[in-house]
């Protein structure tokens, strides 16, 4: 054993464990050790002394860096401001750096989460304000129409909400539905029920024909008195429209009269025990035509037949295909 005495480190350094840095030994040292085995003891002792001194120095440096009491460290730090490479740093310094970075990241996350929570709370408050304003502006539901007694008619308001669509450029007749009064206009669909309703309405409001006749007479007088050409033309068109409607209604009344007479006869035959006979559409038209020609003179009948022939011929021509052009036509 060598007689060299080792220096004892302080008690604080003995309690602290520091892992030595691994450094590969040069090949020359290994060869010397193999050549001189007699000097192993002395070499080991000197190396142990150097390691102990390095440990003491590193421990004292770490303590000074932790406590911050040694003034010489500030001078060393000011002198060595250049960053050291990571492979030369100790594990303690790396751990401290990682802890510091983790604290910074946690602070950033907390700030972002707090900002997001504030934004969501502000959005919720704005939504609540909007809901409150909508509920405030929302009108109360309208009261249901009431009546004084169960026999009295229901009182309804004549007010109607104006449409927000600006359809002044459109044709009102094509877009807006036209309201129809069943007393004056026949229903568009001629089903069995609508036909019955039309007959009932015609019988119930037959007195309107007298009013229409008076209106036509007033129009004739106004046409004679008017001197404005445009106004006179409008009055003539209105008179012509009313006259055509009157003639069409008379034709319908005659056709309905023929059917009513046939039904009356069939009812009497059914009472006698015979089977009912229903007229076809074609037979109904024939009987209506015969009934209209009965009250006409010969010249009137000829003119009516000619008009009917031209009408049928025009319909047939519309159904025919267009003639192909030939070389002569070119």
From Swiss-Prot:
GO terms for biological process: maturation of SSU-rRNA from tricistronic rRNA transcript (SSU-rRNA, 5.8S rRNA, LSU-rRNA). Pfam families: RRP36. It comes from the Eukaryota. One of its GO terms (cellular component) is 90S preribosome. Residues 132-146, 243-264 have a biased composition (Basic and acidic residues). Residues 25-38, 61-82 have a biased composition (Acidic residues). Residues 212-272 form a coiled coil. It is found in: Nucleus, Nucleolus. Residues 113-131 have a biased composition (Low complexity). Residues 1-189, 242-264 are annotated as: Disordered. Keywords: Coiled coil, Nucleus, Ribonucleoprotein, Ribosome biogenesis, rRNA processing. Its main location: nucleus. Belongs to the RRP36 family. PANTHER family: RIBOSOMAL RNA PROCESSING PROTEIN 36 HOMOLOG. Component of the 90S pre-ribosome involved in the maturation of rRNAs. Required for early cleavages of the pre-RNAs in the 40S ribosomal subunit maturation pathway. Associates with 90S and pre-40S pre-ribosomal particles. This is rRNA biogenesis protein RRP36. It comes from Podospora anserina (strain S / ATCC MYA-4624 / DSM 980 / FGSC 10383).
């Amino acid at each position: 054993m060598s007689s060299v005495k080792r220096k004892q480190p302080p008690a604080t350094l003995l309690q602290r464990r520091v892992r030595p840095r691994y450094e590969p030994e040069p090949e020359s040292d290994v060869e010397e050790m193999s050549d001189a085995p007699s000097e192993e003891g002395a070499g080991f002792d000197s190396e142990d002394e150097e390691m102990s001194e390095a440990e003491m120095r590193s421990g004292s440096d770490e303590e000074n860096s932790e406590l911050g009491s040694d003034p010489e460290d500030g001078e060393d730090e000011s002198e060595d401001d250049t960053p050291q490479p990571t492979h030369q740093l100790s594990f303690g310094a790396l751990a401290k750096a990682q802890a510091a970075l983790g604290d910074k990241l946690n602070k950033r996350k907390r700030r972002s989460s707090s900002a997001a929570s504030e934004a969501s709370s502000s959005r919720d408050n704005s939504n609540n304000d909007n809901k409150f304003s909508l509920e405030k502006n929302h009108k109360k539901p309208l009261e249901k129409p009431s009546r004084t007694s169960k026999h009295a008619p229901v009182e309804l308001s004549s007010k109607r909400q104006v449409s927000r669509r600006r359809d002044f450029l459109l044709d009102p007749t094509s877009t807006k539905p036209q309201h129809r009064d069943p007393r004056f206009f026949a229903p568009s669909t001629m089903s069995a029920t609508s036909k019955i309703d039309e007959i009932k309405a015609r019988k119930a409001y037959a007195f309107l024909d007298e009013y229409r006749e008076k209106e036509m007479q007033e129009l004739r007088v106004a046409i004679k008195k008017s001197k404005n050409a445009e106004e006179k033309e409008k009055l003539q068109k209105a008179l012509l429209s009313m006259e055509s409607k009157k003639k069409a209604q008379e034709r319908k009344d005659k056709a309905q009269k023929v059917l009513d007479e046939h039904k009356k006869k069939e009812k009497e035959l059914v009472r006698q025990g015979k089977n009912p006979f229903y007229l076809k559409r074609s037979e109904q038209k024939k009987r209506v035509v015969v009934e209209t020609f009965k009250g006409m003179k010969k010249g009137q009948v000829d003119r009516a037949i000619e008009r009917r022939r031209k009408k049928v011929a025009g319909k047939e021509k519309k159904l025919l295909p267009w003639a192909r052009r030939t070389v002569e036509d070119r």
